[in-house]
Structures are given as structure tokens and as C-alpha cells.
């Protein structure tokens, strides 16, 4: 007799008085308490309707299939088979769960990467939108391209102003970027074939350098030369002075060719544009001027650029001689088109309180180096205007930057001296410690390095691991104890030094005194 619910032989058998069915006591009592009816017939059923079936108390009844050893073995075999099947099913489920978990983890990782990328793109888009909104003109005006006033200033209608009253720059176009890239490729290829010119002054020659001449080029009431550049093809030296003028000096004849007046404060930087008759000057009056020689020797201001809001410390010309960059204490550097005098891009750093004090193009033109008053040297990708590297280590304001013609070395000057950087590994590999290094300059061949501080030192360049030998120490004869700038002449045949006593001094080999003329021929006031 088996239970009508479980199908097993009941331990405590009971029978329904209504249906006559046999049940296990505990099962039928629970069913009645839950449902109140017979589980088989569905008729109403109570506890009183079930009657226990009594068996002998001494011998318990046994089921037929467990009453013999073969029956027990069969039961055990069935139990074992069920256990194995259940274990196999569990292992299958575990394997499937592991695969699903691995897939879910990969999906989670991919989702995190996508979310991070989307957040970055969102932030960049927001920043770009904010920049565009700042430059959207409040009242659009007609723009006349390349218009200039008779005094050299650009016409007001040339400038589209944003809400913050800053000029909206069009950006560096794809055509210009292609031009810069082509120039870089050509110069890089040319550098691989470059050889040191045989006419380059030897080390023995430099060791015998002495002062050949001295020329007072600027006014006595505001003495001092702040910057200098040399047009090697014509042997003309340009100096920028504290007296707010720039002087063009012909070294072979010892004569002043022209005096450029127009700035209201000291001229902080002066540059020739290739072999052309263009000269750039930057000033503490927050402007940059482009000077042109119409052919009569009298330079006139072609453009006055006032895109900066603080003192302009440096100008540097791109190797194409079509573009240039100015760097200012307002924390920006500007990329200009020389032909139109228009600012194509004005770049600021993401970090706050950055003042640019020096700037120079890499010889290939796609890298720009800038120095700051916060002792940091920053390297920029000109195409994207992105800061790609920075060099820390100086103490005090970075006063000068010079790239070597080999394309690998960068020299920087600051209050703690001069440091040399390897652009391939982005590290400082040598330092020349001296107080208040005002200027540092590689010669055009990259063979020599000049440093202007309390005196003028000339070093022979070498590799990263080799020793850079000191060739010559030239005294600062100004009496001010401050040589402000140093430049090498063509093939390093002479060294030009500017000082705060307004004198331009020429150091060279005795007997080669091309410019040893009377100081009376120069401007005294």
C-alpha cells in the first residue's frame, strides 16, 4: 500500500473515511491545514475524517523491493545513477555560468572604456564650444582683409571681436599645415647631407679672439641693448634697445644704416626675416612691428600688431620666412602671417599664471620652444598648437632659448645658468651653472655655443656623453657686469655682444678688423 500523495510506503499510514484513500499522516495533515480538501478527489476533508491504520508494534512492515539484497542493490544503483546525472547537470551549469561571467566582464570592461572615451570627447567638445562662444562677435561687422592704416596699424574693421573683446583668430589652415610639413621634410632631408663648412672658424682661431671694436648704438639717457640679430648674407647687425629703438648696423663699414623708431617702450626682441628686407621688433609696449625697406634704405613700419595684452618678450621666424611667432607675458603666443600681418592663432596654456619670456623655432619648423618666468621650458607642436613636452629644472625666469642646427639639442638660459636638453630623450644632459645667464646661442653650424652672463663664454659642442670644452672666455668690458646678448657671425668668424652700456662689441681675430672705425660715426643720442 502506497501513499496517494508521495507514492511511497507510509511510515504513519492513515485512511480517508470519505474516499478510502491511503495517505502519509504528516502529508495529508499539512494538505488539509492548507487547503481543507482531499488532494485526490477534491472533496472537503477535515482531520476528523482520517483514521490511522495500526500495524504490529514489534515488527515493522518492509517494502517488497527492499526486502532482499538484489532489491537493495537496485535501489543503490538507482540512487547512484541519479547522483551522477545531477552532478553532470551541475557541472554543465557551472561551465555555462563561467562563460557567461567571462563575457559579462569583457562587456563591462569595453563599456568602461567607451564611457571614458565619450566623457573625454564630451569635455573636449564643451571646451571647444566655450572657446567658440567666447569669440563669437556680439555685433558682426564687415571685414576688409589685409587693410592697413598709413601709420602701420591694422584697420579696426579687420578684427572680429568676441564677447571678451579679444580678436577672433581664424586658425592655422590645412594648406598652411601642409606647407609647414613640406618645409620640415625638405629641411630634415637637407640636414642629413649637411657638412660643416670648411670656412668655419677653427678652435685655434676662436682661442685668439679679442675685442676688435665697440660701437655705442643707442641713446645715453636710456642706455642698454636688450636683443640682437645678424643678417649673415649682408653682415648687418640689428639691435633692440632700452631707448625704444632698433638700430641696423653695417659691420664692415661700421655705419648705422637705419634707426627704427615707433615703439614707446624698450625693444625686447629683434629678428631679420631670412635674406629679405623685413625686420620684426617686439616691445614692452605690448606690440609687435613689421618693418619694410622700400629700397631707399629707410625702413618704414608696415604693420603694428597689438594682439597681446602685456609685454611682448620674443619674436621668432619660421624657416619658411612666411610666418612668425610672438611670445608675451600675457600667457599667450601668437602665430602670424607675415604677408598680411594677421594673427592666425593665439595659443594659451591650460595652466594658470604662465608668462612667456622666450621663444624659438626648431630648425625644421614644426616644433616651437618657449620659456616662462616660472622656470619651465615648454615644447609645442606647431600644427596642433599642443604642448607636447616640458622641461623643469631651472631656477628663475628663462631668459633665452636656442636650438642647435643638428636638430637634437636645445640650450636654455635662466638665472641659475644654462642647461642643455636632448630632444630625443627629453632630458637634461649637461648644465653650465653661472649667475644670471642672459643669453645663449648656437652658431649657425651647431659647432659652437655662446653664453652671455657676467662674461661671455664660448664652448665647443659635442655629443651627449662627451665633454663640452670651454674654448674662450671674453670679458664683459661694459662695466655694467651684464652682457645681455651674444651672436655668432657668419662661419663664426666673429662674435657680437650687446651690453647694458649701449655698446655693441665685436670680438674676432686680430688683423681682421673690418669694423674697427671711430665710435664717433655711431649715434650718441
UniProtKB/Swiss-Prot annotation:
Pfam families the record matches: Prp19, WD40_Prp19
Keywords on record: DNA damage, DNA repair, Immunity, Innate immunity, mRNA processing, mRNA splicing, Nucleus, Plant defense, Repeat, Spliceosome, Transferase, Ubl conjugation pathway, WD repeat
Listed transmembrane segments: none
Compartmental location: Nucleus
Domain U-box, first and last residues per copy: 1-70
GO BP terms, alphabetized: defense response to bacterium; DNA repair; innate immune response; mRNA splicing, via spliceosome; protein K63-linked ubiquitination
Note on domains (UniProt): The DWD box is required for interaction with DDB1A.
Function: Probable ubiquitin-protein ligase which is mainly involved pre-mRNA splicing and DNA repair. Component of the MAC complex that probably regulates defense responses through transcriptional control and thereby is essential for plant innate immunity.
The family this protein is said to belong to: Belongs to the WD repeat PRP19 family.
Subunit structure: Homotetramer. Component of the multiprotein assembly MOS4-associated complex (MAC) at least composed of MOS4, CDC5, PRL1 and PRP19 which is related to the PRP19C/Prp19 complex/NTC/Nineteen complex identified in other organisms. Associated with the spliceosome.
Protein name: Pre-mRNA-processing factor 19 homolog 2
Organism: Arabidopsis thaliana (Mouse-ear cress)
Lineage: Eukaryota, Viridiplantae, Streptophyta, Embryophyta, Tracheophyta
Amino acid at each position: 500500500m502506497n501513499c496517494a500523495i508521495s507514492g511511497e510506503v507510509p511510515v504513519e499510514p492513515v485512511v480517508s473515511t470519505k474516499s478510502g484513500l491511503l495517505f502519509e499522516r504528516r502529508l495529508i495533515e499539512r494538505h488539509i491545514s492548507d487547503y481543507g480538501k482531499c488532494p485526490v478527489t477534491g472533496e472537503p476533508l477535515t482531520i476528523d475524517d482520517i483514521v490511522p491504520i495500526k500495524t504490529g508494534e514489534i515488527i515493522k512492515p518492509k517494502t517488497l523491493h527492499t526486502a532482499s539484497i538484489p532489491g537493495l542493490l537496485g535501489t543503490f544503483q538507482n540512487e547512484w545513477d541519479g547522483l551522477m546525472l545531477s552532478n553532470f547537470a551541475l557541472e554543465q551549469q557551472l561551465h555555462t555560468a563561467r562563460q557567461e561571467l567571462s563575457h559579462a566582464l569583457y562587456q563591462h570592461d569595453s563599456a568602461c572604456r567607451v564611457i571614458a572615451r565619450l566623457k573625454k570627447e564630451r569635455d573636449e567638445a564643451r571646451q571647444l564650444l566655450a572657446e567658440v562662444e567666447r569669440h563669437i562677435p556680439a555685433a558682426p561687422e564687415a571685414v576688409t582683409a589685409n587693410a592697413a592704416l598709413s601709420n602701420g596699424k591694422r584697420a579696426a574693421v579687420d578684427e572680429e571681436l568676441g564677447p571678451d573683446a579679444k580678436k577672433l583668430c581664424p586658425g592655422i589652415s590645412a594648406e598652411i599645415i601642409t606647407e609647414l610639413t613640406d618645409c620640415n621634410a625638405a629641411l630634415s632631408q637637407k640636414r642629413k647631407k649637411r657638412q660643416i663648412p670648411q670656412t668655419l672658424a677653427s678652435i685655434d682661431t676662436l682661442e685668439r679672439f679679442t675685442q676688435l671694436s665697440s660701437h655705442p648704438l643707442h641713446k645715453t639717457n636710456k642706455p642698454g641693448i636688450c636683443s640682437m640679430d645678424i643678417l649673415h648674407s649682408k653682415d648687418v647687425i640689428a639691435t633692440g634697445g632700452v631707448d625704444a629703438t632698433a638700430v641696423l648696423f653695417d659691420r664692415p663699414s661700421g655705419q648705422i644704416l637705419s634707426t627704427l623708431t615707433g615703439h614707446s617702450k624698450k625693444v625686447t626682441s629683434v629678428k631679420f626675416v631670412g635674406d629679405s628686407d623685413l625686420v620684426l621688433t617686439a616691445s614692452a609696449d605690448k606690440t609687435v612691428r613689421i618693418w619694410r625697406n622700400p629700397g631707399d634704405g629707410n625702413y618704414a613700419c608696415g604693420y603694428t600688431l597689438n594682439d597681446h595684452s602685456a609685454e611682448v618678450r620674443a619674436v621668432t621666424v619660421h624657416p619658411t620666412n612666411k610666418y612668425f611667432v610672438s611670445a608675451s607675458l600675457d600667457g599667450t603666443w601668437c602665430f602670424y602671417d607675415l604677408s598680411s600681418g594677421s594673427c592666425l592663432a593665439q595659443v594659451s596654456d591650460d595652466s594658470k599664471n604662465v608668462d612667456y619670456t622666450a621663444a624659438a623655432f626648431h630648425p625644421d619648423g614644426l616644433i616651437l620652444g618657449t620659456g616662462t618666468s616660472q622656470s619651465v621650458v615648454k615644447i609645442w607642436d606647431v600644427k596642433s598648437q599642443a604642448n607636447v613636452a616640458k622641461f623643469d629644472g631651472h631656477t628663475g625666469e628663462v631668459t633665452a632659448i636656442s636650438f642647435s642646427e643638428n636638430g637634437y639639442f636645445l640650450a636654455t638660459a635662466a638665472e641659475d645658468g644654462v642647461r642643455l636638453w636632448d630632444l630625443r630623450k627629453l632630458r637634461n644632459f649637461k648644465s653650465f651653472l653661472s649667475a644670471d645667464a642672459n643669453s645663449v646661442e648656437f652658431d649657425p653650424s651647431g659647432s659652437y655655443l655662446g653664453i652671455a652672463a657676467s662674461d661671455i663664454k664660448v664652448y665647443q659642442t659635442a655629443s651627449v656623453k662627451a665633454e663640452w670644452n670651454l674654448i674662450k672666455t671674453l670679458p664683459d668690458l661694459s662695466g655694467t657686469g651684464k652682457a645681455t646678448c651674444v651672436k655668432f657671425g657668419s662661419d663664426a668668424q666673429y662674435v657680437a655682444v650687446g651690453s647694458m652700456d649701449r655698446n655693441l662689441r665685436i670680438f674676432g681675430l686680430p688683423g681682421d678688423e673690418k669694423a674697427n672705425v671711430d665710435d664717433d660715426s655711431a649715434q650718441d643720442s
